[in-house]
């Protein structure tokens, strides 16, 4: 394996990133889909193979879709386990054997998500990943294969919607982090996502990590300039925990979920709908088209 121009040398996994993704559109009535995926834990004995395959098949056929990776794509070492492995003085042949197995596993996983190529906003690093002997992580290797941005530990992604036949442009800002916290209740889990808004201004806030799948919405009053003067509008803000594909409870099979008596998760992902719209206002009997905007909705 060689470093790509995009990834460069050894990139610290704890970096914060800023990036832009261009999404073209033809009609202001067509809905675009932002589909986060993460906490897949491919190769874990309790990875839900069938559900993951069904989701990939569904996502492959979804028109005008974009994807963003939320971390923990494969069942690799945790931070503590990686420190333990690094403390062992392995032979070069053992290191190569581990690297070869890791690359093979990454290639297998890439074959399942290769249909996303060209439509991926980027991949976040999680806390489960493999680090090759040259310093590259398994997530960076996937980014190289997909030709997408490595998002590091957290970051901003601005989605620019550009009309194919005019100069009309709109934007959505997404603030993402693999996740922190392990609240047992849905409210506490989603509160952690909402707290992201205390340090960053965005339209959409996303976290994974705790395997929960939940959505929250809020509205904020903002002033905008228009042809008819200053306008008051409500800005939607979306908060989401993005789900998982790892089963927690299976008869006669051990898991940390069973050991800790954690709640089972509703497997799968959230689906975010982004629809370009134009608002018209009336003044003195005439209608004016005010600034275009993106309408945000989400489903489980």
Which positions does each model-derived feature cover?
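Core catalytic region of metal-dependent phosphoesterases/phosphodiesterases
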Residues: 4, 21-22, 28-32, 37, ...
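Short, flexible loop/turn elements at secondary-structure junctions
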Residues: 38-44, 161-163, 178-181, 243
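Charged, low-complexity C-terminal accessory regions
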Residues: 123-124, 131-133, 137-212, 297-300
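Beta-strand-turn-beta hairpins that frame and shape the catalytic cleft
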Residues: 20-35, 158-174, 234-237
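A short catalytic or substrate-binding loop motif that flags glycine-/basic-rich loops and adjacent residues
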Residues: 11-14, 148-152, 262-266
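Conserved beta-sheet core of the metallophosphoesterase superfamily
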Residues: 69, 170-278
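C-terminal accessory extensions appended to soluble enzyme cores
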Residues: 85-93, 246, 260-266, 271-300
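Short glycine- and acidic-rich boundary segments immediately preceding or forming the N-terminal edge
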Residues: 1-21
């Amino acid at each position: 394996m060689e470093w790509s121009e995009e990834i460069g040398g050894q990139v610290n996994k704890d970096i914060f990133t800023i990036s832009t993704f261009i999404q073209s559109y033809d009609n202001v009535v067509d809905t675009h889909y932002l589909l986060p995926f993460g906490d897949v834990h491919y190769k874990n004995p309790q990875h839900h193979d069938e559900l993951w395959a069904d989701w990939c098949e569904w996502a492959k056929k979804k028109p005008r879709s974009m994807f963003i990776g939320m971390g923990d794509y494969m069942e690799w070492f945790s931070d503590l386990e990686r420190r333990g492995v690094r403390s062992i003085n392995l032979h070069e042949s053992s290191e190569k054997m581990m690297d070869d197995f890791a690359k093979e596993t990454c290639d297998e996983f890439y074959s399942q998500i290769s249909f996303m190529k060209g439509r991926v906003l980027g991949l976040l690093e999680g806390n489960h990943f493999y680090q090759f002997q040259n310093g590259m992580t398994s997530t960076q290797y996937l980014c190289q294969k997909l030709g997408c941005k490595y998002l590091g530990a957290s970051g901003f992604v601005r989605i620019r919607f550009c009309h194919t036949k005019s100069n009309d442009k709109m934007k959505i800002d997404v603030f993402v982090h693999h996740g922190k916290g392990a609240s047992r209740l849905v409210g506490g889990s989603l509160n952690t996502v909402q707290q992201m808004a205390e340090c960053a201004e965005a339209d959409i806030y996303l976290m994974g990590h705790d395997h929960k799948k939940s959505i929250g919405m809020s509205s904020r009053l903002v002033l905008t300039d228009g042809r008819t003067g200053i306008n008051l509008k409500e800005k939607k803000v979306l908060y989401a925990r993005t789900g998982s594909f790892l089963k927690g409870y299976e008869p006669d099979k051990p898991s940390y979920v069973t050991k800790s008596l954690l709640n089972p998760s509703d497997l799968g992902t959230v689906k975010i709908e982004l629809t370009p719209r134009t608002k018209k206002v009336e003044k003195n009997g005439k209608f004016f088209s005010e600034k275009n905007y993106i309408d945000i909705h989400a489903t489980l």
